Amino acid sequence: MNKRMNELVALLNRYATEYYTSDNPSVSDSEYDRLYRELVELETAYPEQVLADSPTHRVGGKVLDGFEKYSHQYPLYSLQDAFSREELDAFDARVRKEVAHPTYICELKIDGLSISLTYEKGILVAGVTRGDGSIGENITENLKRVKDIPLTLPEELDITVRGECYMPRASFDQVNQVRQENGEPEFANPRNAAAGTLRQLDTAVVAKRNLATFLYQEASPSTRDSQEKGLKYLEQLGFVVNPKRILAENIDEIWNFIQEVGQERENLPYDIDGVVIKVNDLASQEELGFTVKAPKWAVAYKFPAEEKEAQLLSVDWTVGRTGVVTPTANLTPVQLAGTTVSRATLHNVDYIAEKDIRKDDTVIVYKAGDIIPAVLRVVESKRVSEEKLDIPTNCPSCNSDLLHFEDEVALRCINPRCPAQIMEGLIHFASRDAMNITGLGPSIVEKLFAANLVKDVADIYRLQEEDFLLLEGVKEKSAAKLYQAIQASKENSAEKLLFGLGIRHVGSKASQLLLQYFHSIENLYQADSEEVASIESLGGVIAKSLQTYFATEGSEILLRELKETGVNLDYKGQTVVADAALSGLTVVLTGKLERLKRSEAKSKLESLGAKVTGSVSKKTDLVVVGADAGSKLQKAQELGIQVRDEAWLESL
């Protein structure tokens, strides 16, 4: 039976690839169904012989307990946005300062969810959400139900690839029709529907909703020397790659493509929100490098946002964790980009003055970055009142005098004991990108603060289960889960804590770079600002901000209290080893290694202080080669770069 099951699995997987990836089926639907039913019958009779890559895994129901956290071996960066031709020109000018004659590749920006797929020996072992770029959620079982994701590859490869999982418009319409018939609320748009589907704990629901993917990058060190060749390689491996793309030599060609896509956008079978422009040559990408947040070799052009008219009803003023007071407009409800919008940001007091926004004005509302509702401008022809908006002079939270500094656009409360600032700081500390304390959201934080159970972040770690039971609506099971989540967060790597402290200008990426270098928050506390400023991709602004924060007596007390409660202050990721054998060297891995997995070789190189990259350039110091090294070895020899083999790496 095992032989027949092997034959059926191989046949059905091949037919599925022909249907979903190549759009060129070689058998009829009825023949596929007949073979599929035969396989199901055999697997039911011999469950111990079910193969890991059986297509029945895609439809079988399984109720999951939850989603485990998963550390990305290769971090996922955000892209810099561009909203105009002028911003694209500026991007091109920056690139040409480093790369004489760049060729660009333009790809559609799919409005879906970023995913990372890891294969070991050609078998799918992990499917993970983007998360914060460093840590995502393991949704492997759900992604196995996405029919165009290969469960196995035609080669026994160790490879990690990235892409977007989305819901086609036709599937979206079908899903909402079913929800309407069942009396359930409809999804606002395909992206929300895809996100909700991938968060399902019942995998059978995922299988029914017909999600799809486009893959766009080999995340593990690339085996090809350009983005275009990389995409073709992904197609060879059986992944679905979006065919709508071009190579361009200048911004004129890019702009023409953007205009063409904009005209076709509404007729596509899936949602897009822009065009991604990348330098095609991977060696040139390597030369350009990264900022703290984004690659310097790519930009995401975003299409102009949909705009609607709404009437301004009133303005709320709220205080953030840094003391900035932000105005939010209450509006007559309007439908915007698939959702109902009744509130929109007015940004700051200077923006209100610049746009001359007045009481009862009719305003144009849009979604900034297709996400945040914002007021764009006033429709002056529909103005009904000359009365200006009331600008507060006192903090809406603590009643302290508000200040409007000369070099700032916003009003600011500088009271360090302002309740709103403290509470927002606590919410930030517990958030996903910071300490990621599951369940400790704004509602619970507000109740804890109101009950005087927490006054600063150290108090969170003094809470006991019984404290949560004092809060309205919290039962024993929830209290136990909250307590467990707080205790678990003590073990986080220290960059999560550093970001959670909410130090001005110190974001999540900067926190990671700082801890990679200094290894612990205590070492960072002792460091001088010159050393901080010298770290690549950081600089003087972050150094000064850290110096100011650590100079306060309160910061020293807080760190001591956090340590006393058992919170980890050490970095648990791959550190930068200053005196290691390969410290500061840029190394490329290429070819097929005989004894080490590529991931093992990469980890060893990094543990020795090397920066491992995917392409050979003039910035490369060393190339480690295996069998069939190909063009990268040839380029290294042409550039006179030192070449070593696997045995040399093992000897270190």
From Swiss-Prot:
Task: Please name the SMART domains in this protein's record.
Answer: BRCT, HhH1, LIGANc
Q: Supply one GO molecular-function term.
A: metal ion binding
Query: Which keywords does this Swiss-Prot/TrEMBL entry list?
Result: DNA damage, DNA repair, DNA replication, Ligase, Magnesium, Manganese, Metal-binding, NAD, Zinc
**Span of domain BRCT:** 577-652
Catalytic residues (positions): K109 (n6-amp-lysine intermediate)
What the entry lists under SUPFAM superfamilies is as follows: BRCT domain, DNA ligase/mRNA capping enzyme, catalytic domain, Nucleic acid-binding proteins, RuvA domain 2-like
Is Endoplasmic reticulum a UniProt keyword of this protein? no
Is Metal-binding given among the entry's keywords? Answer: yes
**Cofactors (names):** Mg(2+); Mn(2+)
Cellular compartments per GO CC: cytosol
Stated EC number for the protein is 6.5.1.2
GO biological process terms on file: DNA repair; DNA replication
What InterPro entries does UniProt report for this protein, alphabetically? BRCT_dom, BRCT_dom_sf, DisA/LigA_HHH, DNA_ligase, DNA_ligase_AS, DNA_ligase_CS, DNAligase_adenylation, DNAligase_N
Q: Which reaction does it catalyse?
A: NAD(+) + (deoxyribonucleotide)n-3'-hydroxyl + 5'-phospho-(deoxyribonucleotide)m = (deoxyribonucleotide)n+m + AMP + beta-nicotinamide D-nucleotide
User: Record-annotated residues binding Zn(2+)?
Assistant: C395, C398, C413, C418
Kindly list the positions annotated as binding NAD(+): D29, S30, E31, Y32, D33, S78, L79, E107, R130, E164, K278, K302
NCBIfam families given in the database record = dnlj, PRK07956.1
Its biological purpose: DNA ligase that catalyzes the formation of phosphodiester linkages between 5'-phosphoryl and 3'-hydroxyl groups in double-stranded DNA using NAD as a coenzyme and as the energy source for the reaction. It is essential for DNA replication and repair of damaged DNA.
Family affiliation: Belongs to the NAD-dependent DNA ligase family. LigA subfamily.
Could you tell me what this protein is called? DNA ligase
Can you name the source organism? Streptococcus pneumoniae serotype 19F (strain G54)
Gene coding for it: ligA
